[in-house]
Design a protein with these regions (language model features):
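Amphipathic C-terminal alpha-helical segment
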Residues: 99-103, 117, 143, 147, ...
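Amphipathic alpha-helical packing segments from all-alpha helical-bundle domains
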Residues: 124-151, 161-164, 191
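Amphipathic alpha-helical segments used for helix-helix packing
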Residues: 102-127, 175
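Helix-turn-helix
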Residues: 17, 21, 25-59, 63
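N-terminal intrinsically disordered/low-complexity leader segments
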Residues: 1-13, 205-228
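Hydrophobic alpha-helical connector segments
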Residues: 63, 67, 77-107, 162-166, ...
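Hydrophobic/aromatic residues within well-ordered alpha-helical segments
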Residues: 14, 57, 64, 68-72, ...
Length: 228
């Protein structure tokens, strides 16, 4: 007879499977056009089995976003904990964001649908989850910025305003990359953005140290130029 621990492991594994299958269906058909039966068919199970784990399609949709954000937050925390220098920490955070967006590039429509659904839905859990994650990212960004200011790498700046602006820029770069057909490396776009922001916020002394790398990026850009 299976023990309670084994039953929980099986249930957790089944739940993860259903989330993975739901991602495929939502990506293919869109959230609103997808039915629980579609997900059941894709998973090769009865529709009733899904309801043992998720009461509604909305609950399953939220579980998909939760899974992605939990993984993203864990990766961000790991990046912060692995570095003591704020400069290398900032680089690690950017690398983590790039990796997340590249991993979920094919699911961009789901992310956009989630944001749109959060604004329309009467269920406040959707918008609360987005705000929760954004607040966490803003907290990390603020902490790093404060350390860069203390290190005299950055000039004085309103930390909270800058952290919020960074969140919008980050999402915007990802969206523009998708709209541009992923025609350039996302990493190059992020590094260019890093140079633009750095050029404005770096102290005079630190700007001199970083000038060769920063100026090179600013001149080259990230969009491949057509040969004349």
């Amino acid at each position: 007879m299976p023990r309670k621990g084994e039953n929980k492991e099986r249930k957790d594994a089944k739940r993860e499977l259903l989330i993975s299958v739901a991602v495929k269906v939502f990506a293919r058909k869109g959230f609103h056009a997808s039915k629980m039966q579609d997900i059941a068919d894709e998973a090769g199970i009865g529709k009733g089995t899904i309801y043992e784990y998720f009461k509604t399609k909305d609950e399953l949709f939220l579980a998909v976003y939760d899974k992605w954000m939990d993984d993203y937050e864990a990766a961000m925390n790991k990046a912060v904990e692995s570095h003591s220098n704020p400069i290398t920490t900032a680089d690690a955070i950017i690398d983590t964001a790039i990796e997340f967006y590249e991993t979920h590039a094919e699911h961009a429509a789901i992310l956009l649908e989630f944001w749109a659904h959060a604004l329309r839905s009467d269920d406040t859990h959707f918008l609360e989850r987005i705000c929760q994650m954004k607040s966490k990212l803003a907290e990390i960004g603020s902490s790093i910025t404060k350390k860069l200011i203390k290190l005299k790498a950055f000039t004085e700046v309103d930390v909270e305003s800058f952290a919020r602006l960074e969140l919008g820029i980050s999402d915007g770069i990802f969206l523009q990359w998708i709209l541009d057909g992923k025609s350039y490396p996302l990493r190059d776009a992020y590094k260019f953005r890093q140079s633009v922001i750095g050029a404005g916020l770096m102290t005079t002394g630190f700007r001199k140290v970083m000038s060769v790398k920063t100026n090179k990026r600013l001149k080259e850009g990230f969009i491949k130029k057509k040969k004349k």
